[in-house]
């Protein structure tokens, strides 16, 4: 187990680097942290088997594609799910811990639980740490993307993201739900704001790619969001599902390039969101529940990694779907991993039961679910962390 003192020292150094770098309002030389983190990341095999899986592994596959959240500290329900290996990941919020010391302690305990359970794949610890207004560790952990974009170019962004990721890595985070790849083309936008690198795809795209590289440099996985792009809409899906009225040609020109750049840089995951996109053939189905829209990530952008939903507990989603219905609809649309995003007791079991029933009834394709689970497990093997590998434990 790593030393908490080491975690906090590393965090202090990293936040000091970020703060010092951002003091100037003008482009400045890249600050290279003196104690840069050098981490070997194994290459992940993107291909998954198309062979018919054993139906006996259905519950394991369902668990792999589920990400849970909860309120407060680890409770008995969460402990039971982790002990049984029934979830692929956990998404932590500021309500789960207090500052960097609390986060380090929490991730240590989570990994201790999953190590003792001897899972075949480590738990994936996830966090929304974009910087600016969307921060979980503590205020000021990292600057907002818009400010970063205005203070330097791609090398500058990469250095800042490397420093931020090194801090997250030391605090036990495996996958960051960042960077934001949305290009803010709608002046009436209410949700992206300074979370985006800007309104010009020619400027935003290389910065998104640099952010992905910086996160990897620091030892953390990267997630592009919010596909197919919230920057062209004016509403907030946490309240009501917004609409992007861009045509296919406009979308190709404004929103696609940044996602392409992030994918080319090696993004591990892409987050889909609740957004009506009639110009893309989504009709009256929100993008992350629309198979034709989600499929564009595979067929048009050539993405072979994990497709993960935005929170299924957002207000806009809840007005249309129950949580179990949303989980099934999201998987049916081609998402590999679902963020349940709800702290109510028992919600995980309801969602898992609904997915299982959908597989048994034939609504969900069994082989497709297995392939999704394999992609997720590859992601867990790459960015999940544990103290002792289960194969070593089983050999003793």
Model-derived segments and their meaning:
Residues 2-84, 290, 300, 318-396:
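Preference for extracellular/luminal or secreted protein segments
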Residues 64-114:
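N-terminal carbohydrate-binding/catalytic regions of secreted carbohydrate-active enzymes
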Residues 64-70, 88-92, 123-129, 175-179, ...:
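Hydrophobic faces of well-ordered beta-strands that scaffold small-molecule active sites
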Residues 77, 98-117, 203-364:
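Second-shell residues forming the walls of enzyme active-site clefts
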Residues 114-141, 157-183, 204-228:
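Glycine-rich, aromatic-flanked loop segments that form ligand/cofactor-binding clefts
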Residues 141-153, 198:
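A charged helix-plus-loop insertion that forms the helical arch/lid used to bind
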Residues 143, 175-197, 219-245:
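Short glycine/serine-rich loop/turn segments
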Residues 150-155, 164, 192-193:
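Active-site-adjacent helix-turn-beta-strand microarchitecture at beta-sheet edges
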């Amino acid at each position: 187990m790593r030393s908490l003192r080491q975690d906090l020292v590393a965090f202090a150094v990293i936040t000091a680097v970020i703060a010092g770098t951002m003091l100037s309002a003008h482009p400045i030389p890249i600050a290279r942290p003196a104690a840069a983190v050098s981490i070997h990341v194994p290459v992940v095999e993107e291909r998954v088997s198309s062979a018919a899986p054993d139906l006996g592994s259905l519950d394991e596959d369902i668990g792999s594609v589920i990400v849970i959240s909860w309120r407060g500290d680890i409770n008995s329900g969460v402990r039971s799910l982790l002990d049984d290996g029934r979830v692929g990941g956990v998404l932590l919020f500021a309500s789960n811990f207090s500052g960097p010391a609390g986060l380090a302690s929490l991730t240590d305990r989570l990994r201790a639980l999953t190590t003792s359970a001897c899972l075949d794949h480590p738990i994936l610890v996830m966090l929304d740490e974009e910087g600016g207004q969307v921060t979980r560790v503590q205020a000021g952990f990292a600057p907002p993307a818009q400010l970063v974009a205005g203070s330097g170019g791609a090398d500058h962004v990469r250095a800042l993201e490397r420093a931020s990721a090194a801090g997250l890595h030391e605090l036990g985070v495996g996958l960051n739900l960042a960077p934001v790849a949305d290009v803010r083309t709608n002046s009436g936008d209410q949700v992206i704001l300074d979370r985006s690198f800007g309104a010009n795809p020619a400027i935003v795209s290389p910065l998104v790619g640099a952010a992905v590289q910086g996160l990897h440099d620091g030892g953390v996985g990267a997630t592009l969001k919010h596909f197919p792009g919230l920057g062209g809409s004016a509403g907030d899906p946490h309240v009501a599902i917004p609409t992007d009225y861009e045509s296919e040609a406009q979308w190709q020109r404004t929103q696609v390039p940044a996602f392409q750049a992030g994918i080319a840089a090696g993004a591990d995951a892409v987050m889909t969101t609740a957004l009506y996109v009639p110009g893309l053939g989504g009709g009256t189905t929100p993008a992350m529940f629309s198979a034709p829209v989600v499929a564009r990530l595979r067929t048009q952008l050539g993405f072979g990694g994990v497709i993960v939903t935005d929170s299924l507990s957002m207000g806009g989603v809840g007005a249309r779907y129950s949580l179990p219905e949303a989980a099934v609809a999201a998987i049916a649309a081609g998402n590999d991993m679902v963020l349940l995003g709800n702290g109510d007791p028992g919600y995980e079991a309801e969602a898992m039961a609904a997915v299982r029933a959908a597989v048994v009834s034939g609504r969900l394709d069994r082989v497709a679910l297995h392939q999704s689970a394999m992609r997720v497990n590859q992601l867990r093997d790459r960015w999940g962390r544990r103290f002792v590998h289960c194969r070593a434990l089983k050999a003793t």
